């Protein structure tokens, strides 16, 4: 068995499964697997074979992202946004904007180009990869330039959602785009002032055959327009050579210098006699719905840490007598941008920040009430996230206060999230941490803390049994299989918590599925968890939070630690 177990450890370490496997988890899983096979298969020659087959099932099949069951989900979930209309209208509008200039448009792409889960939550029907799919419709006309700030390279700035540095994300983005047939022309390093780490990153990219351009730090940016729009300002920057009509400027995160890159390119294009244009593409705030619409309020909640504020665009109101929505940073910087355009082009082609945008999302809302309710739910989730961050020492009171105000403006209460009162009531009944999940059809399932399982693990098994039509009193994992894992955790690995975490529970269920048909049936329900809502009566360990995230469950937690747990500063 030694060689085969070594192979299993390799599988665990090399695959992204239900969890980030550490030594403790590996030991527990191997122990469980060996225990299950030892007690269920008597033929010695078959033991090794079945152990490997179990691990192939667990790690090869279930590590892959489950395909979305479009028909089932679309029947169950209310749709408020027409995604097909959006893809068609948005791509047509960008083509129209290209034609207004000298067949050359620099498009600043704000927000997430793919995996835009915020948009998919507040605009039900919006697909997380909609913006990427829209660009793919323009793939013959488009090339992408990825921008990264030299100070961010120097500081090893990390993307909070992915946990990787900005420079590593540049390579990830390149791979993502090219794998989908989009052309990435180059990488641009902005705000360069001789940083050694930026030089090293540039050399690294060039060794990979990637073109790299540099934009320098300009004193007095962005207010000193006379210097900026001159040979001593933008003129010192590299001219990024592009070959296609649409140049999409994107970045790993905000503050990378996307707009500066666009304007620098305009300066160089006009010097070369090319009347190129600029436009901005951001989904939120949506300019043609009310300022206090829950969809726009949800955007404020999502950016509460940045202190962004939605506001009426005063320039658009003055120019057209029309009320539109923008956010404070674009409104505040517009006079400066306007002055730069005038110096570069001779006149500014836009009368307002709203004019610069090309976003068509507001025209594709087909059920406003569905989008309003989805956005209220998002604000509630953001509130719990901000409270948990405050308790963990990573958030601020100001962020919490702002989202509390947004809740009031959206006329939402915490009890509007159905899983919240369900989890709290279950905790009250049992006197221990509890959890609740809302299925797509509205059913509420709860889980309690037991000697064997934590509340999240109990909830998971109860939900899977409910979806599979299995009696809740039946065991899909034998208690005899759980006890040895607990013994290993507490007696040999130094854990003070004998209860199974969600990842351990999922692996134990996967192993049981090899010999138990009902466990196999429960295992097949995992894809149905995506998009479900869950709430726990205490803050969870990072292991369980990660498990919920990987299952696609939208989780919130009460902002309190489990009694007896040590606070971490």
Model feature map: region roles:
Residues 5, 14, 25, 46, ...:
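Cationic, low-complexity basic patches in intrinsically disordered or flexible, solvent-exposed regions
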Residues 452-468:
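A short, polar/charged loop-to-alpha-helix boundary motif
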Residues 16, 34, 39-43, 48-49, ...:
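Intrinsic-disorder-associated, low-complexity terminal segments enriched in Asp/Asn/His/Tyr and depleted
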Residues 2, 27-28, 33, 60:
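Cysteine-centered motifs
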Residues 256-257:
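Conserved glycine(s) of the Walker
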Residues 71-250, 264-424, 432, 439-441, ...:
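Flexible phosphate-sensing "switch/lid" loops adjacent to ATP/NTP-binding sites
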Residues 261:
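Hydrophobic positions on the alpha1 helix immediately C-terminal to the Walker A/P-loop
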